[in-house]
Curated annotation (Swiss-Prot):
Name assigned to this protein: Sperm protein associated with the nucleus on the X chromosome N2
Region span, Disordered: 1-46, 64-180
Provenance organism: Homo sapiens (Human)
Similarity section: Belongs to the SPAN-X family.
Compositionally skewed regions (Acidic residues) per UniProt: 82-169
GN (gene name): SPANXN2
Ranges of Basic and acidic residues composition bias in the record: 10-26
Biased composition (Low complexity): 170-180
Length: 180
């Protein structure tokens, strides 16, 4: 006479304890599911953070290299003007760089110092270094002959100002040597 009370298919109704236990089991599994994504997020955050640091560091060094290139290009454009000013200065005022050059090379003339301070004269430096023991007249001839070849190799704006300086220094080299 008694018919089991069931929702469908004649199954017995579960006791409230059994249904609560099943919910608890599901709840215990749920925190594990929730924790797993958090752990994976923490790992990815750490990886992303490290990637950001590396990217910033590379970007920062790239800016520094660009700034150095800009500074060098500015120095290259300023150097001809500074060299012209150095020629006009008294020997006492602009002698710090010249003194260093004199100490490092024996028997060099003031023209050699001007050539050493100018950029893009590596061949001239080698020629002048190889003829340290020769007379001053030989050095003047070598540097005036070599400067015409060097100036043709340089860019037009740099070559024009340097050519003027080389011509001035080769014409008045005997006078400049007497001023020291």
């Amino acid at each position: 006479m008694e018919q089991p009370t069931s929702s469908t298919n004649g199954e017995k109704r579960k006791s409230p304890c059994e249904s609560n236990n099943k919910k608890n089991d599901e709840m215990q599994e749920a925190p594990n599911r929730v924790l797993a994504p958090k752990q994976s997020l923490q790992k990815t955050k750490t990886i992303e953070y490290l990637t950001i640091i590396v990217y910033y560091y590379r970007k920062h060094t790239k800016i520094n290299s660009n700034q150095l290139e800009k500074d060098q290009s500015r120095e290259n454009s300023i150097n001809p003007v500074q060299e012209e000013e150095d020629e006009g200065l008294d020997s006492a005022e602009g002698s710090s760089q010249e003194d260093e050059d004199l100490d490092s090379s024996e028997g060099s003339s003031q023209e050699d110092e001007d050539l050493d301070s100018s950029e893009g004269s590596s061949q001239e430096d080698e020629d002048l270094d190889s003829s340290e023991g020769s007379s001053q007249e030989d050095e003047d001839l070598d540097s005036s002959e070599g400067s015409s070849q060097e100036d043709e190799d340089l860019d037009p704006p740099e070559g024009s100002s340097q050519e003027d300086e080389d011509l001035d220094s080769s014409e008045g080299s005997s006078q400049e040597g007497g001023e020291d």
